[in-house]
Amino acid sequence: MASKLSFKRMDSIAETMPDALRQSRYQMKRCFQRYVSKGKRLLKNQQLMEELEKSLDDKVEKEKLVEGFLGYIICSTQEAVVLPPFVAFAVRMNPGIWEYVKVHSDDLSVEGITPSEYLKFKETLYDEKWAKDDNSLEVDFGALDLSTPHLTLPSSIGNGLQFVSKFMSSKLGGKPESMKPLLDYLLTLNYRGEKLMINDTIDTVSKLQTALLLAEVFVSGLPKYTPYLKFEQRFQEWGLERGWGDTAERCKETLNCLSEVLQAPDPTNMEKFFSRVPSIFNIVIFSIHGYFGQEKVLGLPDTGGQVVYILDQVRAMEEELLQRIKQQGLHVTPKILVLTRLIPDAKGTKCNVELEPVENTKYSHILRVPFKTEDGKDLRQWVSRFDIYPYLERYAQDSCAKILDILEGKPDLIIGNYTDGNLVASLLSNKLCVTQGTIAHALEKTKYEDSDVKWREMDQKYHFSCQFTADMISMNTSDFIITSTYQEIAGSKEKPGQYEHHYAFTMPGLCRYATGINVFDPKFNIAAPGADQSIYFPFTQKQKRLTDLHPQIDELLYSKDDTDEHIGYLADRNKPIIFSMARLDKVKNITGLVEWYGQNKKLRDLVNLVVVAGLLDASQSKDREEIEEINKMHNLMDRYQLKGQIRWIKAQTDRVRNGELYRCIADTKGAFVQPALYEAFGLTVIEAMNCGLPTFATNQGGPAEIIIDGVSGFHVNPINDREAGIKIADFFQKCKEDPSYWNKVSTAGLQRICECYTWKIYATRVLNMGSTYSFWKTLNKEERQAKQRYLQIFYNVQYRNLAKAMARAGDQQARQTTTGVAPSEIVVRPKERKPQTRMQRILTRLAGQKPPVSE
């Protein structure tokens, strides 16, 4: 419909809507009367469209109106507030682009309104007194970003690193003196006091250019593999220090790259140069809630994919750091610390071990710091992620002291995960003046409908007042934000993204966010994770195959007996297998896949179906939604008489065996299907494609970006059962007629993964962000300082009081059980006290100071 319209971005709805209303005045009067007839209310998009269609009797007129400009506006409206005689619309014409208008239902007059005015309108439905109070708390973070360049095109959202390089090139271009900020930044580079790249003798841009020219001419005359040590003394004579490269060739490339930047900066050279700058050696990653460990933790409360993500992330980042440091010609040992909570009651895990090496790394560790009760004792038991907020400020201070001790100084980059980790990362990055990145994983505001305006109803259980406040602080404090997909940031044409939902919203009685976060901010970046390629590798790599697991997998797939681990059987084991693996809930839609299969006779004749999901017995589950889905699975198997064609296996947590299971499915020339109603990213899609399985995945969410439909896999519409079943059946029919087609899709899927979805690509991109944004923040120092003061005030007057008002759930549980901590229950890292500099002692003292009391 949108393609038929001549609506331009420059035309505001407030300007164009009146003419459109006049052209269909009679019909729209009827429509708006229907809107206001039931009094004050909030209408969602579907309700708006239904009321519009009900107000039109003539079929031709209805089609004309719905397909026209007014229909387009209403179709693009995410919600509307009805306060008779007015209806206020929140219209989203494109990802990230919102406009608010108010229409009088009697005379159809239209008035453009601000986000703040719209939110006040909306608040009237929930707390009229607060909405009318001129002194209600209103926050506008966008007002402090007016001088910061922003993206303008929806298609550019998520490409922050690329555009920051363009902005920096523009700002530094022109006169030589405009390069002074870059020179000043290079002069700050050091590792434990040892200068890197240049020393203080180079104090002007012209001196730097001369030194670069002399050095480049010199190394050009050397054999390209000449080690740096052979010519280090000559470099120092010109004011150049270590960090340019490990060989003559590498040094020449870096010297030339900086010379090009100084001569005429362009985004490509700018990005390339900062990828080589030796600015990141020590990284701290926060993941606080749940049971963070390397074994026996998955499935425990608040513990899941985030743990797997971070452990894979750490391995990839350490490997990339080691390679960079070597290529920079440095002899430096990098360190990565994953900060999480120490839990004395560890439930058989290692969550009571203070310092634990990360497996398959050399210099990375998990550092666990305990929560403290109000009387200063270690909190023994797990605390829900929703009840964690009163502990975080003290946790940040205790963590800071530990970090400075172990790293013997400040980290170079801090990355937060989820609300709690992001808030603590914000506190420490501000305190230590360190570059900060954040990763949401999930934003709870988008999971619970109307959880902002109805926060009071949910606050006792979820404490969204604290959580949403913390999210706003960390989003706006962060130097860069890492996301997995475009849709996570800005959604699709029809649906806002998770971050976009935080653009303008209100929590009546608490706070109104006239601007929360703008998805056009260049801090947003897409860096998709990969799958662990030591586990998920192609089925064709026979020498790596885990053949000792094949008897177990054969039993899992083909044994005829029902057990507590699997039910159903496959009568014809020569058929290819359709495979799926996910949680057993409504959104993951495993029962939907079973229905697609059951309804399609052709598909059933061609292939078997194997699903790995949830529990098999509803009496063993405590999750209401899972119980419903278990019962539905049994009903579908009976209704479609799937005996002999389906195998249902309960959830599997052994990642190594799961990797070989994918490959065994590929051996049957089968396919993987991800049928979710919505999937934010789709890690199982990456895993399956890594193993060489042709993959069908939902077109709702991240998988639509991972797969190029019809080339590297296939999109399926999870709402259209018949269409989805036909699409899968057609693929297998084509493979039956032309066996090479299966190989073609499998190979294209592997190529897609290698080009876009590996941890190597991820680590390279994130470290480039850390290096580039470190300089970017120095270019915008004054604007950042103003915003940081604003955020500090907001933290102190809002978040602190909300967290203080929360009951400390963990403290209450501790009082009900036992007090004190048995020393033998906590494994403490042996102390190796190292001499501290005076500055380190000062920083450590500061890190350990108690939080000020707020009345």
From Swiss-Prot:
Please classify the protein's predominant subcellular localization into one broad category.
cytoplasm
User: What Gene3D superfamilies does its record include?
Assistant: 1.20.120.1230, 3.10.450.330, Glycogen Phosphorylase B
Q: How does it sit in the membrane?
A: Peripheral membrane protein
InterPro entries for the chain: Glyco_trans_1, Sucrose_synth_GT-B1, Sucrose_synthase_pln/cyn, SUS_EPBD, SUS_N
What biological-process GO terms show up in the record?
sucrose metabolic process
Q: Which UniProt keywords apply?
A: Cytoplasm, Glycosyltransferase, Membrane, Transferase
Q: So what EC number does this one have?
A: 2.4.1.13
A GO CC term assigned to this protein in UniProt: cytoplasm
Provide the leader sequence positions: none
User: Which superkingdom, per the lineage?
Assistant: Eukaryota
- Provide the tissue specificity: Predominantly expressed in roots, flowers and immature seeds.
Q: Quote the catalytic activity from the record.
A: an NDP-alpha-D-glucose + D-fructose = a ribonucleoside 5'-diphosphate + sucrose + H(+)
What protein family does this chain belong to? Belongs to the glycosyltransferase 1 family. Plant sucrose synthase subfamily.
Q: What does this protein do?
A: Sucrose-cleaving enzyme that provides UDP-glucose and fructose for various metabolic pathways.
UniProt protein name: Sucrose synthase 5
- In its UniProt entry, the species of origin is given as Oryza sativa subsp. japonica (Rice)
